[in-house]
């Protein structure tokens, strides 16, 4: 019912999870949509080769989702996500410096997508620990936030490319979102680990 969604949205943690997932899954979707054009425009690759490069990135990110969940089980979802945002932000910011080698850019994008894929798994390792009874509602809201994040990133990168003739600013803004997510997670880390994520409440690593 609509009331369940409104009640869930009244909890500040739901907004944090929606933001964290909009960066990981939204970033994954946005890059998957943007990379074919990026490799073509930036390096003059033909559409088929650009498609292969993009497929390698998407495959890497998809493969890492379950592995990211397993890693989060082992070391904790918060620690996993902090690593994810660090790696993704560094790689995407580095690509923004107009690398001369398409292979170097591909390598950095693969690492970024591996990180974002792992982040998708890590977010959903944490969600059931925080929202026991509202898991269905929260899964829907967080998934929606990921989709909206992907749309906004794709549209934003495209608009910035069109207005500046370059992907640099868009990539750096996306990297800065990763930095923002890192600081946001670092800010709630202590509260989460001493309330619903404490050893007295859950056996899972948070």
Language-model features: where?
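Interfacial helix-cap and linker-helix signal at transmembrane-aqueous boundaries
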Residues: 39-40, 71-72, 156-165
